[in-house]
């Protein structure tokens, strides 16, 4: 009989240890990524119970969330940040876990480090105490964000108890127009399906648009699956995947790589694969997209007006009014021209070398608008090194951007890079929740790195296509 299982179900079945009472499955986790924020309590649980790390060779630690991106001298000025750093250093030393520390050129944002080191591979199960672990699904792995108690479970047993989600195939046909990026694609999908649209599902992204994407673009898409409510998102491995992994430090070598590549490609969902749901979007219709509200589904194309309140259900209107009020915007207002105070290029969503190249192409020969603070924060030390080798740092600095060290930076309010008061930030990150970027009244507009660069130069939301 022909195997019609999609990739998700193949990988799930391969890693299933046993069925648990209550319907969950105990899954073996092939790669466990940890960082300084969600791991200390997990290691404390191990110490309290006299447990060890079951497979330290399947665990990688890095530091990213709380580290400053300007002055990185130890001890950090922030006492809590220094405490977290000291804790992960001690925990990794005591339990034999590999750590890419701040003085290691391999350090960076956890979801950028795993792929660039060749640790992330097709067919894996991957977990991390971080919401955006679904990034790794770009390689044809199934990757889950987990909580602290689950981090402890994996450290101790290398397994995780999970309920199997349904699988939805999201096909995007056609071809993206110039000035439309991977970030626009995922924002468009979330806008159409909603922040709860993926609850109970894993998303398989398929179609011509994803086939043409680079691995870095695919990572951007999979990264934000969680923002649409999905448990994870993935793209089937193909030759683009294989070519990206080959030669990376932790990738298989020689004949082992050839065997691995053949197996990776065999995992792809067959053409007649079974899915619980299928949805199709036309990539030709996707515009540069900007969020206007307080969740990632509240977005519009650059040439659209903000929605009219009457277009929402009665139940939804209260939340929309709240978003308009918080953002100080009005229904039927153009998104184009909304003033910004800060521009942030970086994060696990858009802090890779291709993101910096796209933004630098817009910044070159131009200058940040008066009164705008603009930051470029590479996603890893290796990305930073590559960008500097290409002269991108000089382009950004000449344009008035601050060139920073690697880290999570302004994506979240756990380090010194924060908004102040009612500042509005054009951001290439992944969440626009109230207070997400540090100020309880700060406002976030999500968009692609190129669109952030365009906004920084104009001093307001603008159409990057007019600068290309």
Positions of predicted regions on the chain:
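Fe-S-dependent hydro-lyases/dehydratases of central metabolism
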Residues: 1-468
């Amino acid at each position: 009989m022909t195997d019609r299982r999609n990739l998700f179900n193949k990988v799930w079945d391969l890693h299933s240890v046993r069925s648990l009472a209550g319907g969950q499955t105990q899954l073996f986790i092939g790669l466990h990524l940890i960082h300084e924020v969600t791991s200390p309590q997990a290691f404390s649980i191990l110490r309290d119970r006299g447990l060890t790390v079951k497979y330290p060779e399947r665990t990688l630690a890095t530091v990213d969330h709380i580290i400053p991106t300007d002055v990185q001298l130890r001890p950090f000025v922030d006492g809590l940040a220094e405490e977290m750093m000291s804790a992960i250093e001690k925990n990794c030393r005591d339990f034999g876990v590999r750590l890419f520390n701040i003085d290691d050129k391999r350090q960076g944002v956890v979801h950028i480090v795993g792929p660039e080191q060749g640790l992330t591979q097709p067919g894996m199960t991957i977990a991390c105490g971080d919401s955006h672990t679904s990034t790794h699904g770009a390689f044809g792995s199934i990757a889950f964000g987990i909580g602290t108690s689950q981090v402890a479970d994996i450290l101790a047993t290398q397994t995780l108890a999970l309920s199997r989600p349904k699988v939805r195939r999201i096909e995007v046909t056609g071809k993206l127009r110039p000035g439309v990026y991977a970030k626009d694609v995922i924002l468009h999908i979330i806008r159409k399906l909603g922040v709860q649209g993926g609850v109970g599902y894993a998303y398989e992204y398929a179609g011509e648009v994803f086939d043409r994407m680079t691995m870095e673009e695919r990572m951007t898409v999979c990264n934000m699956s969680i923002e649409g409510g999905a448990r994870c998102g993935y793209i089937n491995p193909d030759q683009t995947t294989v070519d990206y992994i080959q030669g990376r430090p932790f990738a298989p070598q020689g004949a082992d790589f050839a065997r691995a590549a053949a197996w990776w490609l065999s995992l792809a969902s067959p053409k007649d694969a079974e899915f619980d749901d299928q949805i199709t979007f036309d990539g030709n219709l996707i515009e540069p997209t900007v969020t206007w509200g307080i969740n990632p589904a509240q977005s519009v194309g650059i040439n659209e007006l903000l929605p009219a309140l009457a277009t929402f259900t009665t139940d939804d209107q209260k939340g929309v009014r709240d978003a308009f009020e918080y953002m100080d915007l009005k229904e039927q207002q153009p998104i184009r021209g909304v003033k910004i105070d800060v521009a942030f290029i970086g994060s696990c969503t858009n802090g890779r070398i291709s993101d910096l190249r796209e933004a630098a192409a817009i910044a070159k020969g131009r200058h940040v608008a008066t009164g705008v603070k603009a930051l470029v924060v590479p996603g890893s030390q290796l990305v930073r090194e590559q960008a500097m080798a290409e002269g991108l740092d000089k382009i950004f600095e000449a344009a008035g951007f601050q060139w920073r060290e690697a880290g999570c930076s302004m994506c979240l309010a756990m380090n010194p890079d924060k908004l102040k008061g009612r500042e509005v930030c054009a951001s290439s990150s992944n969440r626009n929740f109230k207070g997400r970027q540090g100020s309880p009244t700060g406002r976030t507009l999500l968009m692609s790195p190129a669109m952030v660069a365009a906004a920084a130069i104009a001093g307001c939301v603008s159409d990057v296509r007019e600068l290309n």
